[in-house]
Amino acid sequence: MPRIVNPLDEMLFKEVLKEQQRIRVYIEKARYGKLKTIIEGIDEKEFDLEDIAKKLKAKLACGGTVKKGRIELQGDHREKVKKLLADLGFSEDLIEIE
């Protein structure tokens, strides 16, 4: 990441980064046949995955965690997650739902 001195420039840089993230959202089967929504592709060096997960869990009223650089949410929330990530500033066109 280039060195940015001006805080406004840093905010703009983060916004541009958000719009360039290719995010993949899909489901996996967890224990006992339960589903979990997996969100991967968000750069964990540039963005606080814990904070994003916290916001998503609050909006979706579900549990979840951050593991191995990806966000895991309990239940199938694929379509809702796409809209919520777009609301957080990520480009909706680059969010791939499987």
Swiss-Prot record:
For this chain's UniProt record, which GO biological process terms are given? formation of translation preinitiation complex; regulation of translation; translation reinitiation
A Pfam family this chain is assigned to: SUI1
Q: Name one GO molecular function term.
A: translation initiation factor activity
Name the coiled-coil region(s): none
Q: Which UniProt keywords apply?
A: Protein biosynthesis, Translation regulation
InterPro entries hit by this protein = DENR/SUI1_TIF, SUI1, SUI1_arc, SUI1_arc_bac, SUI1_dom_sf
Family listed? Belongs to the SUI1 family.
Q: What is this protein called?
A: Protein translation factor SUI1 homolog
From what organism does this protein derive?
Thermococcus onnurineus (strain NA1)
Origin organism lineage: Archaea, Methanobacteriati, Methanobacteriota, Thermococci, Thermococcales
